[in-house]
Amino acid sequence: MTTPLTRPADFEAFWQQRKQELAQVDPEFKMIRSDRSTDQMDVYLVEMQSYGRVKIRGWYTVPTHNAPHPAILSLPGYTSTMWPSVDRTNAATLALNPRGHGNSKDDVDPQDQEFMFIGFDPENPQLYIYAGVFMDCLRAVDFLSSRPEIDASRIGVEGASQGGGLALATAALDSRVIFCAADIPWLGDWIGYLEAEFWGWNNYPKLFALHPDLTFAGINQFLSYFDTMNMAEWIRCPVLMSVGLQDDVCPPRTAFSVYNALATDKSFVVYPFTGHSVTREHEKFKDEWMAKKLGVETLGQIYPSER
């Protein structure tokens, strides 16, 4: 099943411009050591300036031994909050809260507004919330690459749901990433998503109320800039994806559309009876896969059933 790409004519130029604008912003990285630190792991609250000079934060956990370390950028689900990941004792982790998420609401606070409506302006896609969120992820890679205790040649990215889509976008837009693990991903094949999922039919009227002159074609054209299916062929690192065939939040067809557009080393794990969730068994499988890509025997993760 191959889904036709929906790239606008200026798609590549659009993203090159966003990256250039990000590069012009001084990141002003700041780190504050947290009392969550242990003998094995240092935990830091990190802060940085991103696209549009928006302040974002995350939690950086790094082993206290055997530097330099490989690193994993962990990305959040839709409007969720990321917290420190202290169990991976053989790799550093940056759990990022992009703009509008968790502790990154100084400059972008959705409050009662639907997050994905922020900056929805058909004439100015560069102002859309996901233009900034995608760049926030690249800024996080900048942070990891800047750290002397990190081996910048061993940085991977992971996430689930929205985080899975963000992981794919990060791998597409930043060649420093050496693997991408995307579970039950969102943000791909927007047309398929809006046709198959209740969100579209519930929210199209709200978009038309905000933009009375908008058309279905206009919505699809706008969202095509932020479609990971259209970015997939830019990914050069290995990709692990998973999907649950009973998922009624991120329709499986959209994940297949992205996967089939990939032109790199790729693996897809399909769970026939699961929905919009990631099983503990898959988490363990993914951690083993990521450890291998990072060149370590194990990430050191201890699962609840093993405590």
How does the language model describe each region?
Residues L168-L214, V270, V278:
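Hydrolase active-site cap/lid region
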Residues W234-I235, M241-V243, D247:
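Short beta-strand/loop motif that positions the catalytic acidic residue
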Residues M1-D42, L299-R307:
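N-terminal targeting or regulatory segments adjacent to alpha/beta-hydrolase or S9 domains
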Residues G58-P63, A67-Y78:
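Short beta-strand element of the alpha/beta-hydrolase
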Residues F256-R307:
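C-terminal catalytic histidine-bearing segment of alpha/beta-hydrolase fold enzymes
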Residues I118-S161:
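Gly/Ser-rich "nucleophile elbow"/oxyanion-hole loop immediately N-terminal to the catalytic nucleophile
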Residues L245-C250, H276-S277:
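Acidic catalytic loop of the alpha/beta-hydrolase fold
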Residues W83-S85, A92-M135, G192-E195, W199-W201:
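Cap/lid segment of the alpha/beta-hydrolase catalytic domain
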